[in-house]
Amino acid sequence: MNYYIFILLSFLFFSSSLCLETCQPFNIGPPPSGPPIPGVPGTFLETYVVKEINDPFTQSKCLDGSKYKFLFTQGQGSGQKKWMFYWEGGAYCGYEGIDPVLSCSERATTPLGTSTIYPDDGETYTYNWPFGPMGYFSSLEEYNADFWNWNKVLIHYCDGSNHQGHLDNPIDFNGQQLWFRGYDNTNAVLKYAKRYLGLNDATDIMLTGSSAGGQATYIWTNYLQTYFPDTVKLTALSDAGFFMDTYNIVAECHFFRNRMQLLAGLTNSANSEVFRPCKYFRTNDIWKCMIAQYIVEDIHVPMFIVNSQDDVSALPSQVGLSCINQGPSTCSQCEVSIIAMVRAELLGHIDRIREKKPQWGFWLRTCFEHVYQSTMAWYGETMDVFNEAKNNYISLKDGLHQWYNGGNLLDVSTSIFIDVLDWESNPNCQLI
């Protein structure tokens, strides 16, 4: 067992070489048991208008080649000129440890690879995903007083490469054509919103997303920070997207880095405009432009980072700790030590960000969870994570309110919550 600690200590903080590491096969295992249980009945249902991109000059498509569609709800009253863009999450091709092309082939037949799940352009669609964009994306005033009446754009995730694909021609796989156009999809949404929805008149814009969409938020914020006029109050919020360049003890490689390198090459995302600001400084390490711990150095927009210190998605898939899926209490003492070291690495990154970026806010719990903007943070939890503030900590809702409404965002001391309890002694954690 000491072998694993030696491996992690040797590689956890190891800065990369330029070559692509070879990863050993591994299986992340099933997710934590138990079906998703909505904690607040009714708050998972949101109705949007479907918008279809029909501009022949865009290259937007989903993996299966279907026309790209996104969801929109019109702002009201004081929110008519305020906008929130939400990048939908859903992992990425190859996260399971299998070949990314095979993974994309399977994904293309699911809601994460097509737009055919949505009705025709102009029709309404009720979004009912248990981890869906509620919380700060909710249209219920009593639940989301700060942002309920904003214009909201849900950028559908259907390219499998973190909304970054930019490949001109499809990849043929067993007679199936796979299209990688994530960059083109987001670009088309922005142009559509400017041309038809009133984005040109925006006074406030928040860029946000969860999980893979949270990762996309870092990437796109870096690019879009010079896209909008200086008169716009531009902010960003990434939820569960701070995936690190950690070492996977089972695959015996920097697995997440490996997957990002493969995806960048497979989908030509490295040559899209979204990477231009980043790759200028990282010509030989373009893969770093897809990983939050490196991207944050270049982001100058005020940002609010929301993340678990013990991310129940990242620990199995990126570090190789599949014991998490059977419940953290099944992890060996060695594995518990590795969890603590990964948490320490995350907090080290956060401390460095806080020193350099005083306008940024933070909300980080030490519970085995993933995605906080929804009512529930993971399988089996029934607590209202967005609203609840038990045991003397700041709720996500209150922290976000204090950060966003802090005038010039120079004093964010009341909107920083970094849990100091570990998961074993944290009364706020349900999944132990």
How should these model regions be labeled?
Residues L18-I432:
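C-terminal His-loop and adjacent cap/lid subdomain of alpha/beta-hydrolase
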Residues N2-C19:
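Cleavable N-terminal signal peptides of Sec/SRP-targeted secreted and luminal proteins
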